[in-house]
Amino acid sequence: LGACAAAANGSLHFGWLAVTLLGIFSIEVAKNASGEIFDWNSGNDQAVQEQDRSPFSGGKRALIDNLLTQSQTAGIALACYLLGSLAGLSIVLWREPRVLWLGVAGVALAFFYHAPPFKLSYRGLGELAVAITYGPIICAGTYLVQRGAISTDVILVSSLLGILIGAFLLINEFPDYHADQSANKRTLVVRLGRKTTSRVFAGLAAIPFVVLFALPFLNFPFTLWLGFVAAIPAYAAIKRLLANPE
């Protein structure tokens, strides 16, 4: 999204876009790897019942299925955090120094999503952290690297994307409800209960489309309405979850 907005205002610098993507991908892999270790040590992954597992919930299963040892997983996390940090540092030194604070915030939110002392995902703050990171931080950061400026338009539109990604995470926490409870992982689903959270999900999934409808009347391009294609599966998910939140 950030790159598309940048392309609308000039030519893309594909080399720096590649470095940006390398940094983002590396930190994502690192976050998942370190998260495997913290979730394993908390007993969270072991508590997930087989019938509750899906491709989007129940953990990555790397340790559960003995695909990797803890040492190997820690090595992957360390290597990817280092690679992502080096990619970000190269951008700061040779392209756009102001991206430093967005990068630091992104790495911190990634690591402390699972890690103590903050353990954001264990305190009902993981959903917000994901929405902020995958929305404004990544998109505004990508635009900043390309155009050398912070765009309030990009921040606004990417916030809608962040809300949807946060809602996606939220709905995938439902199958982990009992496992998260047993490991004292206080996600929003655990904190609010599944019935209340189903209504929260409905609101989160609907808000971006309401704002999306209004944006073209505020000098945004009407092509944004192409995003309403996503309203069909969103409506289906809302209807199904409200009918059977348990």
Task: Identify the meaning behind each predicted range.
Residues 9-34, 98-111, 151-171:
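Membrane-embedded alpha-helical segments that form the functional core of polytopic membrane enzymes
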Residues 32-36, 61, 108-121, 169, ...:
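C-terminal ends of transmembrane helices
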Residues 12, 68-112, 203-246:
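Transmembrane helix-loop-helix
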Residues 34-78, 165-206:
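Solvent-exposed interhelical
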Residues 53, 59-149:
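Intramembrane alpha-helical segments
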Residues 1-24, 123-153:
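Long, highly hydrophobic alpha-helical transmembrane signal-anchor segments
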Residues 23, 27, 31, 84-87, ...:
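Alpha-helical transmembrane segments of multipass membrane proteins
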Residues 128-177, 181-183, 195-196:
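Functional transmembrane core segments of multi-pass inner-membrane proteins
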